[in-house]
């Protein structure tokens, strides 16, 4: 029946039986979705990254000011502000130190069954990480953490908590029932007065840079300026996080197409699902970064279109590509070993007269971890060997 005079179906329903029938249908559909895709199990990231510095920096052997983090419960990108180097400050130190601190907090707050500290949300995590840093500099940062403690209607419902300060961005792609991947979530850049060169950022400088600098401003930025989002996590989701070097130069469709072309659409049946190989994730991140740099070069005498105009912007460029997979017992066991090894190293480094770690024992430990199957959520040893759990 059409609504009077409007030529459309009525949307105001007061019939109780109709309401109950609709509710029952929605519950059945959600139960089917949970049964097929979720299985009420903890999830984690299986991730890899790739970075490429500004071409001029590469020619002059200067440091890449970006940092990336790939760990089971948290992926992140931090983009150091290179102009700080004009004051004799290494722009790469603060981003790396910040992500190292964030990774440590995520390890102790978010690992399922291994957490020893309460998780109070992404803003608190970045605040605590910032307080743990000492380096001078300025950086933007974006983190995405998997929180496996969330429950909806009494069932485990992992969430991805995204926190962004500045102009790094993140996309989450999900495969639908029709087998196609679609962007289900995207952040927006935080830039001051719309200026493409001036992102919101966390800074720490001394009086030689700014005699009137207030060190408390960083905490104000974290508390009042952080963009925080929560998104349901589903096994098989693809997460793409990148610095502005990616998102200034590539349209979202271009990033999605790279992922679609390179990452096979796997069955969403949990019994048949297999994580993507880590080398493939690295190559996807690499192709996204290379495509970003290519957009800053003329083609057939013309500069290509980019989100910020013709020719985009040459920049340090970094990208993390992750797949959401099940957190398995094998993965949990591996990380128990890693944490034990880290605590042992910490004790040795804090005690005078102690002998250094036996390299053969350390190598054997790494070998044991690397033997964990990819189906068990990939070998974290590969991440550990790159330092700070794939902190680059």
Residue ranges: model-predicted function:
Residues 1-392:
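PP2C/PPM-type serine/threonine phosphatase catalytic domain
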């Amino acid at each position: 029946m059409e609504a009077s005079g409007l030529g459309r179906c009525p949307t105001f329903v007061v019939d109780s039986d109709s309401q109950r029938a609709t509710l029952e249908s929605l519950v059945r559909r959600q139960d089917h979705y949970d049964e097929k895709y979720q299985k009420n199990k903890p999830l984690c990231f299986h991730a890899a990254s790739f970075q490429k510095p500004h071409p001029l920096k590469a020619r002059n052997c200067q440091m890449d000011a970006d940092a990336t983090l790939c760990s089971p419960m948290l992926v992140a990108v931090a983009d150091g502000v290179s102009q700080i180097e004009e004051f004799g400050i290494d722009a790469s130190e603060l981003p790396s130190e910040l992500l190292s601190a964030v990774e440590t907090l995520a390890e102790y707050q978010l690992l399922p069954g291994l957490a020893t500290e309460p998780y109070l949300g992404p803003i608190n995590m970045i605040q605590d990480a910032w307080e743990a840093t000492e380096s001078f500099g300025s950086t933007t940062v974006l983190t995405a953490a998997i929180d496996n403690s969330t429950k909806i209607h009494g069932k485990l419902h992992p969430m991805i908590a995204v926190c962004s300060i500045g102009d790094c961005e993140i996309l989450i792609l999900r495969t639908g029932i029709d087998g196609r991947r679609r962007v289900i979530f995207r952040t927006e850049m935080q830039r001051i007065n719309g200026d493409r060169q001036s992102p919101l950022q966390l800074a720490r400088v001394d009086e030689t840079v700014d005699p009137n600098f207030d060190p408390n401003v960083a905490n104000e930025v974290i508390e009042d300026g952080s963009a925080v989002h929560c998104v349901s996590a589903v096994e098989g989701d693809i997460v793409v996080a990148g610095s502005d070097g990616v998102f200034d130069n590539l349209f979202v469709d271009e990033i999605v197409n790279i992922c679609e072309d390179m990452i096979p659409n796997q069955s969403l049946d949990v019994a048949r699902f297999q994580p993507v190989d880590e080398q493939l994730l690295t190559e996807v991140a690499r192709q996204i970064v290379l495509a970003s740099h290519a957009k800053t070069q003329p083609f057939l005498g013309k500069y290509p279109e980019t989100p910020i105009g013709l020719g985009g912007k040459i920049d340090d460029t970094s990208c993390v590509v992750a797949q959401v997979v099940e957190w398995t017992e094998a993965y949990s066991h591996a990380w128990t070993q890693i944490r034990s090894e880290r605590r042992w190293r910490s004790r040795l480094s804090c005690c005078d007269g102690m002998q250094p770690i036996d390299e053969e024992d350390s190598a054997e430990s790494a070998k044991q971890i690397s033997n964990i199957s990819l189906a068990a959520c990939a070998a974290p040893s590969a991440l550990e060997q790159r330092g700070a759990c794939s902190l680059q």
